[in-house]
């Protein structure tokens, strides 16, 4: 069994505020290409953290690929109340995460920032590799998780970068 942690930028970090934004189409094309590659390499579990943006788009791609490929999807939320204050539209997205094959929360409620480090460590300890939409030139809080990933021995990290997306746009033209 091979598990891959899937995470990346949130939609607002990319300046994407509408579900019809054309940038999402490009991002999903990259995700589909990479997911097919991972599946052909033997990945059988995709693990999500339940975040909007890249993770949600990746979840949508994974759900569309489930008819062609044998895979399982998991969501491990940091807290049981994750997303409880999201808008109605985003609640629908949260519901999709809650419909994956395996759903758990690491903590009941937020108590202190140390929980995030423990949560991230748990995810890394229970996955074999990561797929991350992250670019070192556009730092966000993802940098902490990325640093943990790259510091872990024998933990391959596949990065999707803005340069990769530019290549896909070039292929469109």
Curated annotation (Swiss-Prot):
Top-rank taxon: Bacteria
SUPFAM superfamilies: MCP/YpsA-like
InterPro entries: YspA (IPR010697)
Alphabetized NCBIfam families for the sequence: PRK13660.1
Membership in a protein family: Belongs to the UPF0398 family.
Stated name of the protein: UPF0398 protein SMU_470
Species per Swiss-Prot/TrEMBL record: Streptococcus mutans serotype c (strain ATCC 700610 / UA159)
